[in-house]
Curated annotation (Swiss-Prot):
Coiled coil: none annotated. Belongs to the bacterial ribosomal protein bL33 family. This is Large ribosomal subunit protein bL33. It comes from Prochlorococcus marinus subsp. pastoris (strain CCMP1986 / NIES-2087 / MED4). Residues 16-41 are annotated as: Disordered.
Amino acid sequence: MAKKGTRVVVTLECTEARTSSEPRRSNGVSRYTTEKNKRNTTERLELKKFNPHLNKMTIHKEIK
């Protein structure tokens, strides 16, 4: 049997969506799900992803 892996599913949420006063395409918060290796990446994940509500690339941070 295979061992349980060190990969966990994490959720990334946009940091600019709640504080931004820019015009929006629609209401809501942009969230992505991805996997990360807990052994190699112990700190919180931070990626630049596309936010469809703001219609631009924004920083998405890992949430619990």
